[in-house]
């Protein structure tokens, strides 16, 4: 899915009304169907252009004509993309929407916002100038997508890997030109990531293509792969020796850029001080509920003591995959029995051990195919089991991360009725634009909303141990919400944010450090809680609108049908007005 889209809307289709009005004969020959065809053609050309600049996203979406291309970080490429974007923005401003139906006007709004978001990134936020990790990690992600799904024979996918690998050294050279005084935390994170990235190319990429027997192809692959490993090693030395000592930049966006980013990505227009107060209100509500539930479990222990004890309740490693399968079965049965949401397909995600080449990247992950993937259409839920070589202490610590409460919250958020459920509805999304442009407040807001909603509807039989785990996860998202705003508006330092996650978010120091660091480069990770609150308000407003005929299943189904658009757009469709999302 695309969080922000960019490229050119070709002027011949942007000026739909101008073209239609040239002569009476032309006007008569332009019925609504013709205007629709022209608009759809514009959308197709828009995404073709977008994927030219972002081929990794094209591979995920299922457009494999871009599999041999890689993102280009040169000044020339940046200038070309910006030129297209500015032309597109000018054209969109002259578009006459009177010939478009409501669905098309919504799509035009989504595309216009995506153009503005990408221009903001290139011209003002400028992560290409500040974040060393994007250069080393982008190539990894691009190659990983070619490895992880069998949409073509292994030899064909390896040819695309070679083509992409041949472009990675140039990107790393461009990084040395582009990077100007990055924040120290960005350079430090990039250095922390690089050993794993180098290992990925040394071991995981070759392992993924062991079945290929073409000697000439394997020789080409060894050359391209060795060149990437060498270039990454040189980049690592550059970061450590040259860039880190001068990394004294500021990661903060500042209030103005923060507001713009929220507006273009998620259509949030609320003043930041009011937005922040909403976050604190939700934090305090969840903190009070955590204390109440903890006292219900054991009044003699603190919430932290209870949460620590709950980590001991986990399956054995050889039972972990089955535990997730059983949880999926239980969740889908509950959803159907209680008529909470329609499950469009009986096809389940395949629960499997994380493939060897991805084990270093994730503990658990849901991998769904893109909306236009026609070959590798399976979805995989990957779970990383402890390595046989690990010590007993390390294995114990790892399995504590898969305690019963975590298994449930992960299964709800990632699968039913969270991300996988939303994926199952994708075929019903009303347009190409709605399939390809996604809002974080919708996607992550929905998945987070379902964690609480399922327990509210009675899943787990009111077990307070499940509720306290759900509340800890909610407090983590509340802390993200607040820390993101306050760090990027200069009200909270990185160290203060770390302590905030511990003290107010009830997280361990290790989790707190990782979460605070994430917030420096993911400033709007408030979308989890923000989207959840927006969906809860939409549900209340929708219930008021339809009255006694309200059905939770009907509400959820209608929400799913709208795609992954920002909540204000979903509200407009479901409520018929532009009332406030919060």
Outline where the language-model segments fall.
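Bacterial N-terminal signal peptides
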Residues: 5-17
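N-terminal secretory signal peptides that target proteins for export/translocation
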Residues: 1-2
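N-terminal maturation segment of proteins
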Residues: 22-582
């Amino acid at each position: 899915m695309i969080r922000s889209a960019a490229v050119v809307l070709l002027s011949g289709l942007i000026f739909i009304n101008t073209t239609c009005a040239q002569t009476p004969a032309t006007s008569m020959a332009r019925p609504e169907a013709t205007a629709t065809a022209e608009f759809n053609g514009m959308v197709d050309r828009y995404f073709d252009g977008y994927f030219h600049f972002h081929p990794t996203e094209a591979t995920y979406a299922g457009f494999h004509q871009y599999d041999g291309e890689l993102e280009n970080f040169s000044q020339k490429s940046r200038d070309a993309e910006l030129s297209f974007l500015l032309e597109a923005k000018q054209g969109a401003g002259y578009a006459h929407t009177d010939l478009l139906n409501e669905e098309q006007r919504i799509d035009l709004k989504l595309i216009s916002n995506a153009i503005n978001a990408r221009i903001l990134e290139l011209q003002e936020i400028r992560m290409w100038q500040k974040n060393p990790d994007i250069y080393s990690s982008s190539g990894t992600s691009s190659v990983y997508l070619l490895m992880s799904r069998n949409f073509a024979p292994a030899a064909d996918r390896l040819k695309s890997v070679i083509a992409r690998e041949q472009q990675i050294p140039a990107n790393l050279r461009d990084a040395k030109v582009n990077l100007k005084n990055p924040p120290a935390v960005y350079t430090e994170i990039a250095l922390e990531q690089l050993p794993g990235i180098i290992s990925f190319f040394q071991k995981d990429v070759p392992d993924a293509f062991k079945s290929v027997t073409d000697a000439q192809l394997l020789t080409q692959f060894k050359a391209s792969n060795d060149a990437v490993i060498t270039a990454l090693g040189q980049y690592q030395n550059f970061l450590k020796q040259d860039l880190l000592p001068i990394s004294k930049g500021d990661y903060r966006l500042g209030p103005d850029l923060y507001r713009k980013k929220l507006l273009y990505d998620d259509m949030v227009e609320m003043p930041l001080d009011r937005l922040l107060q909403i976050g604190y209100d939700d934090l305090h509500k969840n903190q009070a509920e955590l204390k109440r539930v903890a006292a219900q479990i054991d009044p003699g222990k603190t919430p932290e003591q209870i949460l620590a004890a709950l980590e001991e309740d986990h399956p054995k490693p050889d039972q972990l995959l089955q535990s997730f399968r059983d949880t999926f079965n239980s969740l889908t049965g509950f959803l159907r029995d209680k008529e909470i949401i329609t499950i469009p397909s009986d096809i389940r995600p395949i629960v499997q051990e994380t493939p060897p080449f991805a084990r270093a990247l994730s503990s658990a992950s849901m991998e769904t195919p893109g909306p236009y993937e026609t070959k590798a259409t399976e979805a995989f839920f990957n779970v990383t089991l402890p390595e046989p070589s690990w010590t007993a202490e390390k294995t114990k610590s790892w399995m504590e991360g898969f305690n019963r409460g975590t298994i449930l919250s992960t299964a709800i958020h990632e699968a039913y009725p969270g991300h996988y459920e939303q994926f199952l509805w994708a075929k019903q999304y009303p347009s190409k634009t709605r399939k390809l442009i996604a809002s974080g407040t919708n996607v992550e807001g929905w998945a987070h909303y379902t964690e609480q909603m399922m327990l509210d509807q009675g899943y787990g039989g009111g077990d307070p141990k499940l509720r306290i785990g759900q509340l800890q996860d909610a407090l983590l998202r509340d802390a993200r919400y607040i820390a993101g705003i306050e760090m990027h508006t200069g009200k909270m330092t990185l160290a203060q944010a770390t302590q905030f996650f511990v003290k107010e978010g009830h997280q361990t120091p290790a989790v707190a450090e990782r979460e605070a660091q994430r917030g420096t480069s993911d400033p709007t990770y408030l979308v989890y809680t923000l989207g959840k609150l927006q969906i809860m308000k939409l549900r209340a407003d929708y219930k008021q609108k339809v009255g006694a005929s309200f059905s939770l299943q009907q509400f959820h189904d209608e929400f799913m049908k709208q795609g992954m658009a920002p909540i204000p757009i979903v509200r407009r469709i479901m409520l018929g007005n532009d009332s406030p999302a919060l």
